[in-house]
Structure formats: structure tokens, C-alpha cells
Amino acid sequence: MEIVNCIGKKGDTNFAILYPSLRSNKSLVIELIKKIRKNHKTLVFSNSHLSAELIAFNASKQGIKIGIHRAGLLPKNRKMVENSFKNGMIGVLSSTPTLELGIDIGDVDAVISNLVPVNRLLQRLGRAARKGQEGYAFLTLGNDPISQYYKNHPADYFVDEEIPYIDPFNPIIMENQILAMCFDRPISKLESKEYLETLSKLQRKDLVIFNNGKYTPTNSEKQNVLKNYSIRGIGNDVDILFNGKIVGNRNLPHALEELHDDAIYFLSGRRYKVKKLILDEKTERNFADIDTIPINYPYYTKPIREEYPQVIEIFEEKEIFGIKLKYCSLNIYKKVLGYSNIEIGKEINQGKKVFFNDPITYTYATKGFIFRVPSPKEILKMASEKEKIEASGYHATEHVLIEGSSMLTGGASQDIGGISLGDTGMIVIHDGSIGGNGASKSLFDKFELAITRAHSILIECSCENDDGCPRCTYSYRCGNNNEYLHKNAAIEVLTRIINRERTTILEFNNFQQTLI
């Protein structure tokens, strides 16, 4: 064996961090693409499906030849986009993290990235200038709480490292992995002790049998269960149909929010309208039928939803400042009540609301933690609508805790949901995946720093609106149309936490309105 040491060919890369004080993040990105694309192949990274699709959609409207690469598209379509970019047929590619590593897309001259932890940013920027040419790299901040924080504390960005999070005990993953183990080699009674609960579930589903002291698959046809299992997501998929053909898919529970009836869905830079969402619990055959809409249709949609939590089992407890936190397993009862129409090109998080006659309901098991925050007593002394102001303060607190801690938890805010339980002060922060993904545990472990950072974001934001603004209290994931928010009440809540005001966790079953 011969070990070869050498230095790879890598050109100098010019790097800039940009903060859009007078425009939206998407407008800034489009302007960068227009300036760079003529002589430089450009890769644009977004952190969500919708952001990547909106970049491609808006760029196409301005005459830019751009492809899109993300999960949920058919593999053959992703491969076609990769080859088109590699061969120079398109000069700009809008992508989610699917292109961060491991896929050959040829030479890249410029990289534009939304906000991610610094070690992931370096991975993205490493895509540029690999053939020795001069490269260009841009980190574009946005109109959101964590971007506002880094604008005021830029040095913190370079010390906030990504800590990978995972939940190895996710029951969905365990069932599929242990079933695969049985196909590989029967599991003996002796080695099955730590898997007994999962093996019992597989037995009840008639996937394995216990015979002659070993667990074996019931028959070879059960391998079809594994063929339908994807490491890209957890839980069942919803197939997306156009003219009777599958053109993509989306995981539950996220599919409920993006593929409900009349939702506007972005696919490969184009917009479609969902004619009907079908969820068949018996056959697990789930699909959404989509159709084209006029090019000049002015809106896209965001869901209006409610969620109700149920605590199943407490795993861990601790106290931060005067707040008790309990990490636990949960059932989340989700309702999609309707949607908001958001005007294309407008950087707003509120829109005209449409409600369904029959809300879509779905229940899933996950993990998260619960806690109770103190009441904003001083604000309430002057308030005429005390219950509304109090609930709005707790809702804003929940938003900024999740959005503002994103880089502390390795960007986990995208995989986290939050529920504020009316005017009780009870807040639930949970994993957004069926069975759990470890994201909320990451925030649970760094909760003290999350509190102080959330407090800084609110007091440093110059807006004077009662409900705050996109840079402090708003969340693009809000299920309540970014309504019922109160910035000053949230500041008082967080100040009281930092001053170690103690609270007691309440038992909860049925509260009035929840805010998410």
C-alpha cells in the first residue's frame, strides 16, 4: 500500500456576509444571481423546500435559466438537473442541503447560502473554486430573529458550532432496522433482550414470528415493507400526482401543511394547486392530486393550524434559572383549519385567511419538553384585554426561543414545533418528525443560552410594533398567521426568567385555544 500526500487544487474564494436592511432576503439573492450568473456557474443553497422553490420561481420570472434540486422530487428529475448544471445547459441551481456533499455537479464558481451553522457553511462554500479558479461565496442573512442577532453580534456566528442531533430510539426507525436485522440473520432470544418491545410490535403486525428460540420474518414478501422505507424521512409518504402520474412525494406530518385541498404547491420552480388530498389509513395509500394554475396567479399559501399535546412519559427533568423542564414522549393532535393566501414577492408573514368546513386531523407520536414561564404582570396591569395580551406574550416567547436558538442547536429550529397553551404560561417544544428526531433534545440541553439569546433578540430589535416584526417575534412556521403576538410581554417574560422567578408546571389536558 502506498500513501500519497498532496494538496488539492483549490482557488481563492472571496467571501462576504450580507444583511438586507432595505429589502427581503429573496430579493437580495435574486440580485446576486443576476450580477454573478453571466460568467460564473452559481449554486444557491436554501434551508427549506419552499425557499428553494421561491428562489427558482422568482428567478425564472426574471428570465434566469435556473434548475431546482431538493428532496421530494423524483430521482430521475434530480439526476437530469444535476447533468444539466454539470454540462452547462443551466448556469444557476437552487438547492436545499441535498447538494451539500456527495453529488458530482461539476465545477462551481459561486455559492450563495442562507444562514446555517458555520461548519455547514464551510461545507457549502467548499463547492466553489475546486478547479483552481477564483471563487465567490456569499452568506445572506434574512429578516428573521437569528439573522438580527448575528447582525448585532457577528463574532458569535463563528463560535456557534453545529452539534448533530439524532434520536436513535425513534420507534419507526427501530422497527425497520430490526426487521432488516431479522432478514439478514434471525435474532436469537439471548440477543433480543434490548429489542423485546420492538420485536413484540413486529409480531403484532405479523412481520416476524418467534420459532425455535429465534425471531424470523414471517415470509419474504414482508421485505416490501423495507422497500417502502426511506432514510430521507420518517413515517408515511404522500405521493404527488399530476395527470395521474407520480411527480414527487412529501412526508407526513409535513404533507398536511403543504398538500391540503387548495394549497399552492411549488414543484421544480412551478406552482400547482392541490385539487384533493386523500389519506387512506387502511391501505396507507396517501396522495395529493395537483393541477396547473395561471402563471400570473398572485398567491401562494401557508397553513392555519392547531396542535394539542398529550404527555405520555417523562424521561428527564432539570431546572434552568427558576424554570423546571421535563423532557418526555408526546402525542401531538394536529388540525389544519385552513390557509392564508400570501402575495408572491411580498415579504410578509400574514395574509388573507380561508377556513375549511372540515378541518384535516392527524395524530402522531414524538418527543419534546414542557415548561411553564412566568406571567408578564407589569404589562397586564395596563392591559384592557388581559387574557389576550398574556397569551400573546407566551406565544411570542415560544417563537423567539425556537427561531433565535437555531444556530445553538445546529439549525434544529426547522425540525422543531412549538405550542403555547393559552394564557397558562405552559409551553411545549417538540420534534417535528414522527417518533422524534433529537432536535428538541438539543434545545433542551442548551436552554439557558437559548433564554439569554432570545432576550437579546427582542430588546435589540428597533421595531415599535406591539406584535413585533419578522426580525424578532414572527416565525414563517407560525400556524396562527403570525397573530396573537406581543413583543413587550415576551420581553417581560424572559426578563423574569433571567431574574430566576420560579414557576410550577401545570397538569394539562384540555386548554382553550393553543397557539403555535
Spans of model-derived segments:
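Conserved phosphate/anionic-ligand binding catalytic regions in large, soluble enzymes, centered on
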Residues: 127-130, 464-474
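Extracellular/secretory pathway and lumenal proteins
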Residues: 5, 473-476
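ASCE P-loop NTPase motor cores of helicases and related translocases
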Residues: 31-39, 476, 496, 515
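Acidic, low-complexity intrinsically disordered tails
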Residues: 497-516
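Extended Lys/Arg-rich polyanion-binding regions
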Residues: 134-137, 143-160, 175-191, 223-464, ...
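Helicase motor core with emphasis on the C-terminal RecA-like subdomain
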Residues: 1-185, 192-225, 234-235
